[in-house]
Amino acid sequence: NHILAGLPLYGKKILITAGPTYEAIDPVRFIGNYASGKMGFELAKSAANKGAEVILVSGPTHCKIDSNRVITHAVFTAKEMYNVVHQHFSSVDAAILSAAVADYRPKKTALSKIKKTSESLLLELEKTEDILEKVQELGIEVRHHLYIK
């Protein structure tokens, strides 16, 4: 620990989100995106190398991280990601929300594979949780925002 004590982020806890989230249409199909999670994993690696304890909340990705300073929580949906972020948000010094979270999910998820019975399929969608908006509602002060589009 005496070696880590000289690092700039030693003693800090950072929460980072990474990757996509997927929203099930039925047991074999989902709404998702092509986010790789690479940016979030690189941010986690960098923060850990600078001495931080990192909580990494990742959607489905092939990225891996090998660091005893990173605790990874694998999630699938926007709701699952929100739940883990909510659980840890009040205990961290900083949060970087870099995941590509789905904006919408099917209002109803079919319990079995949807069969091709007609020429078209109509899906009704509803908004997912806005993670940043929801954590701000907890009354936790968010002092600095950096939005990158």
Regions picked out by a protein language model, each given a short descriptive name:
Residues 1-15, 106-109:
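YjeF_N-associated NAD(P)HX repair module
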Residues 8-77:
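Glycine-rich phosphate/diphosphate-binding loop of Rossmann-like nucleotide-binding domains
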Residues 48, 53-149:
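Glycine-rich phosphate/dinucleotide-binding loop and adjoining beta-alpha-beta core of small-molecule
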